[in-house]
Amino acid sequence: GYNRSFLRF
């Protein structure tokens, strides 16, 4: 999984 923070979703 990955954080939405850096993707700005």
Curated annotation (Swiss-Prot):
Give the subcellular location: Secreted
Question: Which family does the record assign?
Answer: Belongs to the FARP (FMRFamide related peptide) family.
Q: Which residues carry this modification: Phenylalanine amide?
A: F9
Name the major location. Answer: secreted
Q: Which GO terms describe its cellular component?
A: extracellular region
Name the source organism: Callinectes sapidus
GO BP terms: namely: neuropeptide signaling pathway
User: Which keywords does this chain's UniProt record carry?
Assistant: Amidation, Neuropeptide, Secreted
Could you tell me the superkingdom of the organism this chain comes from? Eukaryota
- This protein is called FMRFamide-like neuropeptide
Purpose: Cardioactive peptide.
